[in-house]
Amino acid sequence: MSEAGSAFIQTQQLHAAMADTFLEHMCRLDIDSEPIVARNTGIICTIGPASRSVEMLKEMIKSGMNIARLNFSHGTHEYHAGTIKNVREATESLASNPIHYRPVAVALDTKGPEIRTGLIKGSGTAEVELKKGATMRITLDDAFQENCDENVLWVDYKNLTKVVKPGSKIYVDDGLISLLVKEIGPDFCVTEIENGGMLGSKKGVNLPGAAVDLPAVSSKDIQDLQFGVEQDVDMVFASFIRKAADVHEVREVLGEKGKNIKIISKIENHEGVRRFDEILEASDGIMVARGDLGIEIPAEKVFLAQKMMIGRCNRAGKPVICATQMLESMIKKPRPTRAEGSDVANAVLDGADCIMLSGETAKGDYPLEAVRMQHAIAREAEAAIFHRQLFEELRRVSPLTRDPTEATAVGAVEASFKCSSGAIIVLTKSGRSAHLLSRYRPRAPIISVTRNGQTARQAHLYRGIFPVLYREAVHEAWAEDVDSRVNFAMDIGKARGFFKSGDVVIVLTGWRPGSGFTNTMRVVPVP
């Protein structure tokens, strides 16, 4: 052990990671143990007024942002095109410095099949107070579309009276206002206000338990997705996915030109949780969208859904994102609550590939502090994972295979634990070799070298992959080309402090040029 102990890379909670039981693992965690240098979890930031400028985006990239999320529930196409341009400008401005350069991905978050209320007294900014116990009439009569008040509220979902029944709940504005349905007419229902408050215009409506039959992809979504293809976004976060057919519909809209865009399905209601397996099968990844989920299912059950979804994604080897309210209090305060710190750490311990910030970076007062805080918590949590048990279980559930790349990936991760390697270096074109390594959750960062920009950007969705973009011309001698890419990864790893001369790294390469031939693993001392 003394020899492995001198490899400074792996001191991070190593004693705990190799315990025999989970209880023993917890007993051995040590607050004075230094976390790993690399952070393995991806950080997704929503870009909005607080973070749109090139200057701010540069700082966010330096602080650790990997994926920029654009929320298409708000803003025009011009606005989002400007944001995308700024993100790319900020990313490329750091390209001259290969150490700081990170290929940042762009994600388009669709509005999805939302139900919204009408305008209060004809104005977008007016508010009325709803009093507990009062009666509120919900109407589908378009005469009230721009003329709602404390007595009558118009909603834009025409089948409302068919899907709710007396005793149903209707939630408005993220669950802040709740209404209890008393009686139902042909184009209206009478409700009692259970929870009052100030109601503004065009607020979101949730109908927990109702079988809402809205199209998965609205006409606005179709325009937004086509815009995304033109803008060359890397991934789509598809809102309110309820079944596999919804995912296929999004794929169809993306079409041939957008066939390489990753589709991450957002699970936000009971039906989505119930039909999780078919959705996972059809998607490239999953987002646990805890905001709407916490209204659609009881708040005390959200953590169960989170653990179940993360577990099934880890088992299937697909990326999973934990989102909503992770550091919510940092919208207004420079430090998170203790509960939020715990929440971020536990999402990482559960096995999330990425953690997301919404309002914290889009409209908050402390966007940079929020990114740095997530980065710091994630590093500590990653060191505290019970790697010994996790690797054995992941290896056990992975199907038997004759695919050389899969077999090599398992071997490489096992070897990386055995020799406490500073990193696993992999050369990849499509990204698949790196994704397979990520699936087995090595402690060491996976430095994935590729010439394909999109492969590099999408790799941020997977835990532990540190993508680097290799921009030199292809060498005519293939073996020389392999060596120059491996050396490039070594230089970056040393400059970033992942390892130093004399440490060992594991190198995965193919036996011939092209995609799909990765089958050679070498254990190499760092020069």
Swiss-Prot record:
GO BP annotations, alphabetical order: cellular response to insulin stimulus; glycolytic process
Record keywords: ATP-binding, Glycolysis, Kinase, Magnesium, Metal-binding, Nucleotide-binding, Potassium, Pyruvate, Transferase
Alphabetical list of InterPro entries matching this protein: Pyr_Knase, Pyrv/PenolPyrv_kinase-like_dom, Pyrv_kinase-like_dom_sf, Pyrv_Knase-like_insert_dom_sf, Pyrv_Knase_AS, Pyrv_Knase_brl, Pyrv_Knase_C, Pyrv_Knase_C_sf
Residues at which ATP binds: N71, F72, S73, H74, R116, K203
Pathway(s) the chain acts in: Carbohydrate degradation; glycolysis; pyruvate from D-glyceraldehyde 3-phosphate: step 5/5
GO annotation, cellular component aspect: cytoplasm
Gene3D superfamilies reported for this sequence: Phosphoenolpyruvate-binding domains, PK beta-barrel domain-like, Pyruvate kinase, C-terminal domain
Amino acids binding K(+): N71, S73, D109, T110
A Pfam family it matches: PK
Site (Transition state stabilizer): K266
Amino acids binding substrate: R69, K266, G291, D292, T324
Binding site for Mg(2+): E268, D292
Sites where the protein binds beta-D-fructose 1,6-bisphosphate: T428, K429, S430, G431, R432, S433, W478, R485, R512, P513, G514, S515, G516, F517
Cofactor(s) required, per the database record: Mg(2+); K(+)
MF (Gene Ontology): ATP binding; kinase activity; magnesium ion binding; potassium ion binding; pyruvate kinase activity
This enzyme's EC code(s): 2.7.1.40
Quaternary organization: Homotetramer.
Classification via PANTHER family: PYRUVATE KINASE (PTHR11817)
Membership in a protein family: Belongs to the pyruvate kinase family.
Function: Glycolytic enzyme that catalyzes the transfer of a phosphoryl group from phosphoenolpyruvate (PEP) to ADP, generating ATP.
Official protein name in the record: Pyruvate kinase PKM
Organism annotation: Xenopus laevis
Protein encoded by which gene: pkm
